[in-house]
From Swiss-Prot:
UniProt source species: Arabidopsis thaliana (Mouse-ear cress)
Domain of life: Eukaryota
Tissue: Expressed in roots, leaves and stems.
Protein name (Swiss-Prot/TrEMBL): ACT domain-containing protein ACR7
Annotated gene: ACR7
Protein task: May bind amino acids.
Keywords linked to the UniProt accession: Repeat
Amino acid sequence: MELSDCSNEYEKLVVRMNMPRVVIDNGVCPNSTVVKIDSARSPGILLESVQLLTDMNLWIKKAYISSDGKWNMDVFHVSDLNGDKLTDENLIRYIEKSIETSHYCKTEGYTGLTALELTGTDRVGLLSEVFAVLADLECDVVEAKAWTHNGRIASMIYVKDGNSGTPIDGDSDRVQRVEGQLRNLLKADDGYQNDTRTCVSYGGNTHMERRLHQRMFMDRDYEKKFDIEKSPIVSVQNLPKRGYSVVNLQCKDRMKLLFDVVCTLTDMAYIVFHAAIRTVGETAFLEFYVRHSDGHPVSSEPERQRLIQCLQAAIERRTVKGVRLELCTADRPGLLAEVTRILRENGLNIARAEISTKDSIARNVFYVTDANGNLIDPEIIKSIREKIGIDDLSVKEPFPISCREAVEKEQHIEPQDHQGRYGGGTVLVSLGSLVMRNLYHLGLIKSYF
């Protein structure tokens, strides 16, 4: 056997040895499925696992995370969108296979499409103007997401040529026209320190929501002062003897909360060694034992404050604002521009948007408020539905209430028992003892505690 063949076989062996081992158990908890992931420690592996679970629309109710030397053990209690445990055997097998291969078999991503990344100052009707420009330039929007936060907007849009269905980035003149017109729309207000940013690229496998977090982070949306009474409660304390910084968070529970927090810690180069996450009614409590990638805990007060601000911003970006409108109809050229124009003409601001097209069916979600960020008069919503189509546009709950009810049922807690958890706004419930107790029971702690 040649040396190169030996090397290839060795590499395959290493990959097989380091592939995550997944156990999915439906017998432990009455209302949730337990997903246990045992894996070799590597940069970003926790984020990949959380990302995969959230991309499958699984609600993470509780989690215990620990590393011991070169190995990780992550335990997630998950449910579906209705708050029920997973019973579909095909789905369970798919989750196992996806987690076991996700770290070594990357997806192809958005091949055959052109990616547009936009960052700028938010204003009423901006997204409507963006989609109108793309329609005029015969660019079909296949998938897009847009977030707004602290007066800023970040969006990632995948487009193709409206006639040929091919990427547009092969035509440099057309790309320049697209960039130029979008940049004019996104020009920052006078005196704002950050420039408008646009970027055109081909395909790629960038996770859209992680990229939006990165765009907002680069745009420093976290620097604006937060409303203390409404902001997530975040504290950062050092444990000098153990060499960790302990990050505690308390906020309203919602889908993808853990992903948003872990994504931000990862992008800020903090490594999670141990963590515990739990929910009490509508409130989520998260605790992380972290170090910076240089091996040190948080080393200064400015760094501590910046970490707190960035985590608060990461949670707030996805916080539901306004009324959720869902559009489901046959796709056609200019549909998105037409629908958003009607919203703009009725004085509605799009606080968040999720656009997708599959098999010639457009499925779009808009979170809308009035121009001042307040709730909308129901009569205006009724008028808009009549213009767009009663059967095509519907008003939905922001998130399924049944998920919260399932958590309360599992924990035998009445909703009113935890209404005052935010009282005072300064005291966090420490999960330190909970972390250690569960990690000892799992046999995962040897030297860290």
